[in-house]
Amino acid sequence: MRAAVTGEYGRYGSISLTTDSESFTPIKTLLREVLGSARSRMDSSAAAFRSALGKPSVYCDFLEPLPVSYLADLMGITAESELSVRALAAAEQNGQVVLLLWDGGSRYYQCVTAVQPSTLTEVLDHFELGVTAFAFEDLSGYGQHLAPLSLFPDPLPELPQLTVTESTVSTETLLSVLGFNPHTNSRYTDAGGAEVVVEGDRVIRISGSGTFSYTSGGETVLSVESAGGLPTPREAVSGVLELLDQLIPEGDARLYLLEWQQSETATFLTFGYQSSGVPIRFADGSAAAEVTLSGNTISALSLRPRQYSAASSASPLLPLRQAMSIAGRTEGAELSIGYADTGCLLY
């Protein structure tokens, strides 16, 4: 995630925090109180959101819109909400702390909270405030062409170089984890070179690159635990990750939730890879994993197994002004720091 902590005389910025990192703990404690006491939600605006970021505040950008109930669970509380938000900010306003939410599109909201400004100040004291800026604050002229909430940490972080191996999961491991008979003889190679394993109506298809897919054919062998008919965001994500983690090679990258959608009968989740909080994106724009739940049954799954290893040397970054100039050629483009996986090389 990206985070910014703003005080009276400076701002701390990070593009590599994770919700389980030690440095996130003060923010997590604050957000637990803010989300737990938020009430009286009302519509707000982009201008109000940006204005709040110039005051004493804590800002978190989760990179993609995620259910508020899932974000609350990451903070250690339960919150009932149908909203999905990409970013939020806890900011001081008229002697109180308000919660501002952005859905990643055109909708903004604001809530009052029971949190005192002194609690926010205590969080600010945990961070060394520098001169991190948002694109909408940039006075050079470069930032005006970018997405307004593009965050420019100063100084720029030093990220390790990553090496990548296109890893394959053994057929035996797949059969075991996905609940197939390990001694099945119902397997063949299709015309495209993929290995296909069939058991009843369930099918595993393994491509030559190691990417595989699974379909249940209506059978209910694989499922996630849920208290009701449809799993909550927490139940779905934790249950699916418990399965996928058994199929991801050991290394310096893990999966994180990219997208969540739920209808009356089904849940669709996509995941990407991240290393130390920095996203790894495939050049073709595809996700690392996609999972469909019918009720609480895993009805379809695909995974692109990759093994990433961090080196001791730093990965070079473009100078900020140069990166802003290049990104600004596309009006409204978001400038962010991440790794790009082109298949055999990683930048």
Give short role names for the model-derived ranges.
Residues 1-6, 11-12, 255-257, 298-300, ...:
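A broad structural signal for short, well-ordered beta-strand segments within beta-sheet-rich domains
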Residues 1-234:
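Preferential activation on post-signal-peptide N-terminal prodomains/segments
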Residues 87, 93-112, 130, 237, ...:
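Zymogen propeptides/activation segments of proteases
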Residues 86, 172-216, 251-297, 303-304, ...:
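Exposed beta-strand-loop-beta-strand "reactive/processing" segments of non-cytosolic proteins
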